[in-house]
Curated annotation (Swiss-Prot):
One of its GO terms (biological process) is isoprenoid biosynthetic process. This is Prenyl transferase. Its EC number is 2.5.1.-. Transmembrane segments: none annotated. The lineage of its organism: Eukaryota, Rhodophyta, Bangiophyceae, Bangiales, Bangiaceae. It is an enzyme of class 2 (transferase). The gene is preA. The keyword Magnesium applies.
Amino acid sequence: MATSSSLFHPIEKELYSVEHNLKSVAGTRHPILYAAAKHLFEAGGKRLRPAIVLLVAKSTSEQQEIKPGQRRLAEITEIIHTASLVHDDVIDECSTRRGEKTVHKLFNTKIAVLAGDFLFAQSSWYLANIGNLEVVKVITKVITDFAEGEIRQGLVHFDPSISIDDYIEKSFYKTASLVAASCRGAAMLNDLNSQMHNDLYLYGKHMGLAFQIMDDVLDIAGSTKSLGKPSGADFMNGNLTAPILFALTQEGKLDQLIQREFSDERDISLALFLIKKSGGITKAKDLAKEQVQAALCCLQFLPKSAPVSSLKELTHFIITRLS
């Protein structure tokens, strides 16, 4: 199975540059914000989002070159993603992320909210300096999508009546919108036609959805060590994801546990057992596979190249994260 480092080989130098720049994003004028941002970016992460932006940029360039604006867009994508995680952790009261203390636990809630706000503002500043108004419009829409997704999620906590379609729509707003918009933005900076913009947008959308579905599978099937946070953390907070929704169609007892919000100390372990027993995890993985197949179809117009191969292989990497 390919590793993320081998998949990123065509953009290895550019990704290293992005990583280096992220660690200095807050500057030294704001010591507390700098410390918070440094903590966030040094905690690591998969950096899949900036990598996808760079791969799209190279895949759609005749010379396989990455423009400065595209490199900056890759950084902006990760900054926006990180800002959203800071706010998510406050809302969900998470204590760890990527195996490290969350910002609001390391500092306090006020600093965490301000750090997230600062990163969103910083991303907007960098975005404006790319100098392409259409790209600015595409990317800034993502920030409103994040808020929309968070509101939708908050309104259906511990609600077993939500559908898979509701879940997919919420997942688009919270996760896939950023990947989709960033892919479109990278293509726009290479002056491609609108159909190509749309195909790459859809690639990003389907990849983002597949990634979110597999994240939700891992939340239930993964270990605390591999996740960097307690397993089952999302559904303990009432966030009902694909494996749970599929399990609900087979296990009536699970509905009862959700309705009482896992109030008994044994409810969580019983819920995990029922989800695994019902085949909910397998069905969720099948849903993720449908998304990656749709993503692959969106790349058919691109000529063969190493960056295109990496974009295709990334789909398999996402699906095999549990292997």
